[in-house]
Amino acid sequence: MNDAKKYIVSVLILLVAGMFGGCIKEDYSDCPRPFRLTVRAWDADMQDITETGAVQRVVIFVFDETGRRIDRLMMDAAQVAARKPIPLEYDGPTTVSFVAWANPDDHMLEETANVQNVKDLFFRLSSTDGIAQSPGDLFSGVLTCPIEYGSIEQGTDQTVDIYRRTAQVHIIIRGYQEWLDANGPRQLPDYADILLGETPDTYTGLAELIGNAVQYRPDGQIQNGDFISPIFRVYPTLDTTPLHLKLYAYGQELLNISTGSDGVPFIPVIGKMLNIYIDLRGANLNVLVSVTPWDVVQQQQYAEY
């Protein structure tokens, strides 16, 4: 190839690059301005908890104004805690929406990995026969912002705020073993069961509750005859409907409790701890219910330990 042909080819390459790149050196009117995105986490009391380590990982779906996915970003715990910005540049859309979900489990990440439209984005609990696995400490948030054009200079930095989407539950049942023994002999390995429900099993990407009703099985232990659950998480109920705690023995539902002895209902509060204390000893059933801050168990429930 002679020099003249090389020159012509070079000019054609530059012209094509200019047509598809959108940014011509003499005119930046079609150029999107680069910008940076950070994630900020809040608790239920609107305290900034970004640096506490509560957020272990974040997946951020980026949608254009039509709802079409144009990007998918991941951040780890260290990046979130350090408030590390993500450098971004999107050429084409007039606005973008960042839909961020923190602490999804591997199943949720796998289910959402290939979602191409915001209307198809769901965070569904794993469940078997209507019994759901307790979710992780989920956060989510949405930020919609315009894409700035007309310059290659740094654009406006953006922050997507994320908030908790689950409630915690802690259960103590005093005299549980004695109550079981009083209701018949142990004939089967699954002679006893405790279920708490119901809640929807699905969040949309925009944090709307939908889906099927599910229950949760607290994975507790019997200590000194009392049932004590670990702290576990649930999705909230629809329209602040109370949860029902059902106690089974030998395949039969023997107790169904949804309020404290004072009439306070078992309503899970997003970002808070629902404490349920049941005393099966004595002639009268005694039930206490309280709501405390995240990770704070009602200490009076341990007064007799």
Curated annotation (Swiss-Prot):
Annotated localization = Cell outer membrane
This protein's GO CC annotations: cell outer membrane
Its domain of life reads: Bacteria
Lipid modification S-diacylglycerol cysteine sits where? 23
Keywords, sorted A to Z: Cell outer membrane, Lipoprotein, Membrane, Palmitate, Signal
Signal sequence coordinates: 1-22
One Pfam family cited in the UniProt record for this chain: Mfa2
Membrane association type: Lipid-anchor
User: Lipid modification N-palmitoyl cysteine sits where?
Assistant: 23
Task: Show the InterPro entries listed in the entry.
Answer: FimB/Mfa2/Mfa3
Family (UniProt): Belongs to the bacteroidetes fimbrillin superfamily. FimB/Mfa2 family.
Further information in the entry reads: The name (major fimbrium subunit) does not indicate the abundance of the protein, but is derived from the greater length of the major fimbriae. In strain ATCC 33277 and strain ATCC BAA-1703 / FDC 381, major fimbriae are 300 - 1600 nM in length and about 5 nm in diameter. In contrast, minor fimbriae are only about 80 - 120 nm long. This length difference is observed only in a small number of strains, including strain ATCC 33277 and strain ATCC BAA-1703 / FDC 381, and is due to a loss of function mutation in FimB, a protein that restricts fimbrial length in other strains.
This molecule's function is given as:
Anchoring subunit of the major fimbriae. Regulates fimbrial length. These filamentous pili are attached to the cell surface; they mediate biofilm formation, adhesion onto host cells and onto other bacteria that are part of the oral microbiome. Fimbriae of P.gingivalis are major virulence factors.
Describe the protein's quaternary organization and the partners it interacts with: FimB is not part of the fimbrium itself, but anchors the fimbrium in the outer membrane. Linear, head-to-tail oligomerization of fimbrial subunits mediates assembly of the fimbrium stalk, while the minor components FimC, FimD and FimE probably form the fimbrium tip. The anchoring subunit FimB limits fimbrium length and is important for solid fimbrium attachment to the outer membrane. In its absence, the major fimbriae become very long and are easily detached from the membrane.
> Would you tell me the protein name for this molecule?
Major fimbrium anchoring subunit FimB
Task: Please give the organism.
Answer: Porphyromonas gingivalis (Bacteroides gingivalis)
